[in-house]
Amino acid sequence: MTQEIQPGVFLHVLPTEKFKTVRFMIRFSARHTKDNAGARTLLTSLLETNSQNYPTQTALSSRLAELYGASFGVGMAKKGNLHQVNATLTLVNGKYVGDDALLAQGVAFLREVLFAPNISNGQFDEATFQVEKENMLSYIKSFAEDKQAYASLQLQQLFFKEDADQ
């Protein structure tokens, strides 16, 4: 089944009877640059926290609970010179809870959080933005304490010193 959830953005569903859960993963890929990496990372936290219809983290969590304890997350990955933003939703297969509309509700939830973020006047909610920005800065500062992550970062800097976008 293929569904267009936004112009130019398609959802492909591969039906199977093997699992009792349904997992959606939506991936947005773009070229990785030094200038966009921080903004994209912050964006993942902002999208994961709230949206227009779920303006607080509590409201978003309540909606996930209504979807039979669905789990949702937005993260990022780097593959070669691509920077990927991945949104994942996992929910129980509706046939096991007698809710045939659950799949459509899951798609609607993803559409809401991805395409109706908590923005007004062209800006993210200020309080949410500040909290997530501070969280990201704290995470970056903690790298020096994680010796394995710090060593990996230093290795990347040595290896890619000629390519500023890496």
Residue ranges of model-derived segments:
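Acidic/histidine-enriched alpha-helical segments
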Residues: 116-140
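Short, polar/flexible loop-turn hinges at active-site or ligand-entry regions and domain interfaces
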Residues: 50-53, 94-97, 116-125
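M16 family metallopeptidases and their MPP-like homologs
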Residues: 14, 20-32, 58-112, 148-166
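Active-site SXXK
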Residues: 40-48
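N- or domain-start disorder-to-order transition segments that initiate the globular core
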Residues: 1-22
